[in-house]
Regions:
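Short alpha-helical donor nucleotide-sugar binding micro-motif in glycosyltransferases
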Residues: 255-256, 263-268
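A short, histidine- and acid-enriched strand-loop-helix "catalytic/donor-clamping" loop
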Residues: 106-126, 141
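Donor nucleotide-sugar binding/catalytic pocket of nucleotide-sugar-dependent glycosyltransferases
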Residues: 133-183, 193
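Membrane-proximal helix-turn-helix segments that form the acceptor-binding/catalytic region
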Residues: 93, 101, 126-143
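Aromatic "clamp/platform" in nucleotide-sugar-dependent glycosyltransferases that forms part
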Residues: 276
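Conserved acidic donor-binding segment of nucleotide-sugar-dependent glycosyltransferases
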Residues: 308, 312-320, 327-333
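Short hydrophobic beta-strand element within catalytic cores of glycosyltransferases
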Residues: 293-296
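Nucleotide-activated donor-binding/catalytic signature segment of Leloir-type glycosyltransferases, i.e.
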Residues: 240-256
């Protein structure tokens, strides 16, 4: 007998959580053996402490619109007490129908990426998603949410909601950042950044990430620093043209992942995420674990990880406000005499959240 977890794919920022779920007795099922944002998937799979099983199905456009085959056979085999499903996707409705048709007793938990901004400011993916937000909580036993304010909203309206932000294992990540420090020192020397303050952005270069807003805010800053942009996407050429029009240098590095990316987090002093639509923003956890101070959009779910102790939350449409916040955070990062290992600035513990999840799942299994 095992519980069942169903996910889209295996992104690097969820590996630690998935490993814990497997240890808690979940069989791990996924739509795909590839994550569209990861190049070296084989290296990522080596970090899995479980054997993933890939579902057969028919994809109707995006991966999230997948009709899965053989679900009843899996349920009969595993005999689960709990099934965790992704968001409000087709597989949720398949599981609900199977439960109703067979009068099964297993509990259903949906993992939902809603940020509070999406809920409160009508900043949704679609009208359908907005409608489903009102329906699905009435049909499932609980909902796992990334944003603590979104969790509070679900608790208020449906008396359901488990806060589980995307977090990496603090201790494991600390060791990894320390391990790549020699590479960080080497890279910083190559680019002349050993004693220069660095503002870092990591992500897709698409409109909702508002990288143009970051460049415009950087142009208005008074503190001496360098903006480094890691990522690729459809806006690359336009962003490079914008960067060439300002009087400061912007370093575009393209797509980087794995240890090389960790090395850049060690080099950075301030991390910026200025998205206009961002359900969460897993990069914020990565940056905080590396000791980066944060300037984050109030639209991002991960702003629940940021306080005055480790950064600032800004309106992504206010460029002057963002520039001032970046100046303040660069100053608060202190003098930079060398590239060194820094303690984490995370205020939320991975193990604490996993222990909380374990307790909640036990209560759900018991029907409490």
């Amino acid at each position: 007998m095992a519980n069942i977890f169903i996910g889209n794919s295996i992104p690097p920022y969820r590996i630690d959580t998935y490993n814990v779920l497997a240890k808690m007795g979940f069989s791990m099922y996924f739509y795909s053996d590839r994550d569209p944002d990861i190049v070296n998937m084989d290296a990522l799979l080596e970090l899995c402490e479980f054997k993933p099983t890939y579902l057969q199905g028919k994809q109707l456009g995006r991966m999230s619109r997948t009709i899965c085959f053989g679900l009843w056979g899996i349920i009969k085999k595993e005999k689960p007490k709990v099934i965790i499903v992704p968001e409000f996707q087709i597989v949720l409705w398949q599981i609900l129908i199977l439960k109703w048709l067979t009068c099964s007793k297993f509990k259903i938990i949906s993992m939902c990426d809603d940020s509070y901004d999406m809920i409160a400011n009508d900043n949704d993916f679609s009208r359908v998603h907005k409608w489903l937000r009102r329906l699905v909580p009435r049909l499932v036993d609980d909902i796992i949410l990334l944003d603590v304010k979104a969790k509070d909203w679900y608790q208020e309206h449906f008396q359901k909601g488990i806060w589980l932000p995307i977090l990496r294992n603090d201790d494991l990540e600390s060791d990894k950042y320390r391990k790549v420090l020699p590479r960080s020192i080497e890279i910083a020397a190559h680019y002349g950044l050993s004693t220069t303050k660095v503002i870092l952005f990591v992500g897709r270069l698409v409109k909702v990430k508002n990288v143009s807003g970051i460049i415009e805010a950087y142009a208005r800053m008074t503190e001496h620093c360098k903006l480094v942009i890691i990522g690729d996407g459809e806006e690359m050429n336009d962003l490079q043209a914008l960067a060439s029009s300002i009087s400061k240098e912007v370093l575009f590095l393209g797509r980087i992942e794995g240890e090389e990316l960790r090395a850049w987090y060690n080099i950075a002093d301030v991390f910026v995420l200025l998205s206009t639509l961002e359900p969460y923003g897993a990069v914020i956890n990565e940056a905080l674990l590396a000791g980066n101070r944060i300037v984050i959009s109030q639209k991002a779910g991960a702003c629940c990880l940021v306080s005055k102790d480790n950064g600032e939350i800004v309106d992504p449409y206010h460029i002057v406000e963002t520039a001032n916040a970046l100046d303040r955070q660069v100053r608060m990062a202190g003098d930079k005499k060398e590239i060194r290992f820094r303690p984490s600035l995370m205020k939320v513990s991975f193990q604490e959240r996993m222990n909380y999840l374990m307790q909640r799942l036990q209560r759900i299994r018991l029907g409490l």
